[in-house]
Amino acid sequence: MSNHKLIEAVTKSQLRTDLPTFRSGDTLRVHVRIVEGSRERIQVFEGVVIKRRGGGISETFTVRKISSGVGVERTFPLHTPKIEKIEVKRRGKVRRAKLYYLRSLRGKAARIQEIR
């Protein structure tokens, strides 16, 4: 078996199929498993997807939310076992793949139109 086929076989077994389809502009609730010492808990991070990048096992997505008036962005690997589940709350209507312009917008200007 060639190296390429071997790598492809290993990564295919690691890919997750239980996650919903989503794209930039969608509002997600990401349930992340957090380990603190011997305890484990689930933390929910809700925000707008501003980008998806990569493909295969190394695919990542970035979620942005406003917390206490401060913008917080968190990048997650898509196929990590640390993600318990992803819920799509709203489907956003955007015409860009990368929504970096949201970083400079404040308040109602930063809203994204919902797909009906």
Curated annotation (Swiss-Prot):
Query: Which cellular component appears as one GO term in the record?
Result: cytosolic large ribosomal subunit
Q: Does the keyword Ribonucleoprotein apply?
A: yes
Keywords attached to this Swiss-Prot or TrEMBL record, sorted alphabetically, are: Ribonucleoprotein, Ribosomal protein
Record PROSITE patterns: RIBOSOMAL_L19 (PS01015)
What would be an example GO MF term here?
structural constituent of ribosome
Q: Which GO BP terms apply? A: translation
Which Pfam families does this chain map to?
Answer: Ribosomal_L19
Q: Which Gene3D superfamilies match?
A: 2.30.30.790
Domain of life from the UniProt record: Bacteria
Q: Which family does it belong to?
A: Belongs to the bacterial ribosomal protein bL19 family.
Q: Which NCBIfam families match?
A: rplS_bact
Q: What does this protein do?
A: This protein is located at the 30S-50S ribosomal subunit interface and may play a role in the structure and function of the aminoacyl-tRNA binding site.
HAMAP family recorded for this chain? Answer: Ribosomal_bL19 (MF_00402)
What name goes with this protein?
A: Large ribosomal subunit protein bL19
| Source organism of this protein record | Staphylococcus epidermidis (strain ATCC 35984 / DSM 28319 / BCRC 17069 / CCUG 31568 / BM 3577 / RP62A)
